[in-house]
Amino acid sequence: IVEAAAGDDQIHVIVLKSGADRTFCAGASFNDMVAITTEAEGKAFFMGFANVINALRKCPKITIGAVQGKAVGGGVGLAAATDICFACESALIKLSELSIGIGPFVIEPAVKRKIGNAAMAQLTLKSQPSSSLFYLDNS
């Protein structure tokens, strides 16, 4: 969708937002991750998400993230991949990957680019959600 919008001369700005007010994006489905049984399946699963993040990062159009509610795991990566990201005061961000035994390797480059190494490490190791002010204070 991002690549199609990027190639459409009628579209000048892409806004990434949720259709609800409580969750921006909860990231990858835990059930889908548990169903992965081979290296090839794992690579395809995670590369699909990496391709979306890279499409946002490389998009020639202005991309805007509008975070209302929770952004968890991959949702944080999507928000970070946009050119400009706005979040409401009640928005919460959390990297949940370590709690399921993996690192945030797919989203790390985009998030680190936005908030830096120290803030990325803090967000990765923290078990509780952070307020949207965490991004503001670290970007």
Indicate where each model-derived feature is located.
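A structural preference for short, pocket-lining loop segments at secondary-structure junctions
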Residues: 1-37, 55-66, 88-92
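Alpha-helix N-cap/helix-start motif
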Residues: 23-26, 42, 75, 104
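An acidic, carboxylate-rich microenvironment
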Residues: 32, 41, 133-134
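A short acidic, glycine-rich active-site loop
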Residues: 35-47
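Crotonase-fold acyl-CoA enzyme core
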Residues: 55-139
